[in-house]
Amino acid sequence: MNFPVQATVPKGPERDLEIVPFSSHLARLGLRLTRQTTTTLQINLGLLCNQRCLHCHHEAGPDRREVMDLRTMEDVILYAGRARFQAIDLTGGAPEMNPLLPNLIQRLSPLTPRLMIRPNLTLLNQGNEDLLGLLKRHRVVVLVSFPSLDKKELEIQRGKGAFPESVAALKRLNDLGFGRKGSDLELNLISNPTEACLPKSQEQEEKRFRQELKNRWNVEFNRLFAFTNVPLGRFQHWLSQSGQEENYLRMLAQNFNPSTLEGLMCRSLVSVSWDGYLYDCDFNLAGNLPMGHRRIHVSEIDAPPAPGSSIAVSDHCYACTARSGFT
């Protein structure tokens, strides 16, 4: 399987893929997706990125202009102070390409017991000593995408040269204490398939990655999460271009596992976009499905979304409920 070198999601209405819509599937089973207690605030700092990863559900890249500004950031910080989440998750794009990130980390750190960031490994290997020092001082949990132990597979997905740069960045994080045994600095990996298939067992993948990274490069990490590629953004376009979109969605639907609903991240997380609007998850942000089916700005609310609130769904939700789920 080869992804295209570059891809852009076609505009216009979604194709009729002749599968039961996700919402209808839930209804047939007598299920309804609603919120539990919302404990995590996810903040998307923008779609600017130094790479054009070919599985990216946002189509992030160096030419994107959607970046959180200071006024919106202040609104988000005030909301975090009012609502007091158990965890705050910084994502993008590449969040480290937002020049306001250092200020945000310093402001958010006292407001939550668990501050997380999803940086780009290839950027962490390009200087950024000040940022790395800041992450260490504030005990920020680092989650990074490392989809494959195979150089060719990883670079098909993340671009030429990404493999050695990613390994070097992991070693650099280890040198600072992230992911090392006995350290309280947490480093987690995210792996996802490089083909149109479901991920392998997370337990087996974590064991395999741990052994190979340690043996080949003396790299350590805390946990690995094996996630399904969500059919949005560039990945959706590749599926469409290669004639696999219908089969992929059908595979996801056929592997629907109702037991995954209990732990879905959208039930305990609220996502805020770079322009300050709220979504049930980052995938719904990419799919333009606002929380409550209406545009609510972060400055308009004082508390986390209430338990029992309905969650906006679409067919991409099959990815989060297939087999072991995406939690």
Name these PLM-found stretches:
Residues 49, 53-56, 266, 281, ...:
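Short cysteine clusters
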Residues 3, 7-92, 96-107:
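Conserved alpha-helical substructure of the radical SAM core
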Residues 52, 84, 111, 138-139, ...:
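Short loop/turn motifs at secondary-structure junctions
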Residues 150-266:
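Radical SAM enzyme [4Fe-4S]-AdoMet core and its adjacent flexible, acidic
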Residues 272-273:
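Short, acidic, Ser/Thr-enriched surface-loop or helix-capping motifs
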Residues 40, 60-69, 83-98, 109-127, ...:
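Core AdoMet radical
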Residues 41, 77, 105, 132, ...:
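Generic structural signal for well-ordered alpha-helices
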Residues 277-327:
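Flexible mid-to-C-terminal extensions adjoining Fe-S/redox cofactors in radical SAM and related proteins
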